[in-house]
Amino acid sequence: MFITLEGGEGVGKTTQQALLVERLRQEGYACLCTREPGGTALGKTLRELLLHGDPFSPLAELLLYAADRAEHVSKVIAPALAAGQVVVCDRFTDSTLAYQGYGRGLDLEKIRQLNHLATGGLQPHLTLWLDLPPEVGLARAKARDRLEQERLEFHRRVYQGFQALAAAEPQRIVRISAQGSPAEVAARLWSVVEPRLPLATAGREP
């Protein structure tokens, strides 16, 4: 089963990913915990450039994320799924649509085509969207990297993007309120994940 966590800055994805993976392992599931960018050696290099380097043009940024994703799927995600593991990934294709599409204003259909090329059509079985108003998330994040230092209007557009994506695919993308303590949010996530675990099968777009 392939699970992704999505959301804006400061929503607590890293914390919730760790708690979810811990719970899955307690329940006896073999898990892979990974992230984008940064899930491969190439990804770690690109992550440093993308999050802490000088700004790129929107198109260059998009293509770097796609290169990271192609390597990540090929070398990490696809082999783990083939081995029967539950893969839990911090960010995937929906982040590219929200940030580079809605946030940067790049063409959504072209981003979808590039995502499809980079992933070979691989889609998450379940996407957990951690929902938190941008103003609250940015206050939590305290501008730790370049993306978090973007203007509030950019983050509002990203938030609207996640709203639109969730509305378009309600069976896959489930909104989870990120308000409350980490334990409270983790309980909400588990209530969504647990019923879907018996249905875990490898899934690809047609």
UniProtKB/Swiss-Prot annotation:
Record-linked PROSITE patterns: THYMIDYLATE_KINASE
Enzyme Commission identifier(s): 2.7.4.9
Cellular-component GO terms for this entry: cytosol
Keywords, ordered alphabetically: ATP-binding, Kinase, Nucleotide biosynthesis, Nucleotide-binding, Transferase
Broad class of enzyme this protein falls into: transferase
Annotated residues for binding of ATP: 7-14
Transmembrane segments: none
Entry's Gene Ontology BP terms: dTDP biosynthetic process; dTTP biosynthetic process; dUDP biosynthetic process
Keyword hit for Kinase: yes
Tagged with keyword Metal-binding: no
GO MF annotations, alphabetized: ATP binding; dTMP kinase activity
Gene3D superfamilies: P-loop containing nucleotide triphosphate hydrolases
InterPro entries for this protein: P-loop_NTPase, Thymidylate_kin-like_dom, Thymidylate_kin_CS, Thymidylate_kinase
SUPFAM superfamilies: P-loop containing nucleoside triphosphate hydrolases (SSF52540)
Pfam families given in the database record: Thymidylate_kin (PF02223)
Reactions the enzyme catalyzes: dTMP + ATP = dTDP + ADP
Summary of the function given for this chain in its UniProt record: Phosphorylation of dTMP to form dTDP in both de novo and salvage pathways of dTTP synthesis.
Similarity comment: family membership: Belongs to the thymidylate kinase family.
Protein name: Thymidylate kinase
Organism: Synechococcus sp. (strain JA-2-3B'a(2-13)) (Cyanobacteria bacterium Yellowstone B-Prime)
Lineage, top ranks: Bacteria, Bacillati, Cyanobacteriota, Cyanophyceae, Synechococcales
